[in-house]
Amino acid sequence: MNVLLIFLGCGAGGVARYGVSNLMYLLMGKQFPIGTLIVNITGSLLMGILFIFILERLSGNIQLWRSLLLIGFLGGYTTFSSFSIETFNLIEAGHYFVAALNVLLSVALCIAGAWLGVLIGRQL
């Protein structure tokens, strides 16, 4: 059952990532990997919220919710591999400052998003 929930969640998360990334690139252009950055920040925020909510607020079989939402949906939604290749491509193109900015913003804002999500989750 857990494998099926992970499969379904991951598929939905991947479709959501595709939609959000493409919307960001459409609105803001592709000079900076904003689509991946926004996806990873919002995914980190949701991870914090849902992690606390599932652990502290839900009763019953929390493993099912964890499999569907945390491992499945957010695993399919967030993307370290896209972040990595986009940063590599920036470096290879000689855009060292933009690559460094991408790394700094991604790490700092994703950690901040997870922290904020935990705070929000505790208030629910």
Swiss-Prot record:
Xref: InterPro entries: FluC
Topological type in the membrane: Multi-pass membrane protein
GO cellular component, one term: plasma membrane
Domain of life assignment: Bacteria
Keywords: Cell inner membrane, Cell membrane, Ion channel, Ion transport, Membrane, Metal-binding, Sodium, Transmembrane, Transmembrane helix, Transport
Location in the cell: Cell inner membrane
Catalysed reactions, as listed in the record: fluoride(in) = fluoride(out)
Chain segments annotated as transmembrane: 3-23, 34-54, 68-88, 100-120
MF-aspect GO terms: fluoride channel activity; metal ion binding
Binding site for Na(+): G75, T78
GO biological process, one term: cellular detoxification of fluoride
Chain's role: Fluoride-specific ion channel. Important for reducing fluoride concentration in the cell, thus reducing its toxicity.
Family to which the UniProt record says this protein belongs: Belongs to the fluoride channel Fluc/FEX (TC 1.A.43) family.
Name used for this protein in its record: Fluoride-specific ion channel FluC
Organism in which the protein naturally occurs: Coxiella burnetii (strain CbuK_Q154) (Coxiella burnetii (strain Q154))
GN (gene name): fluC
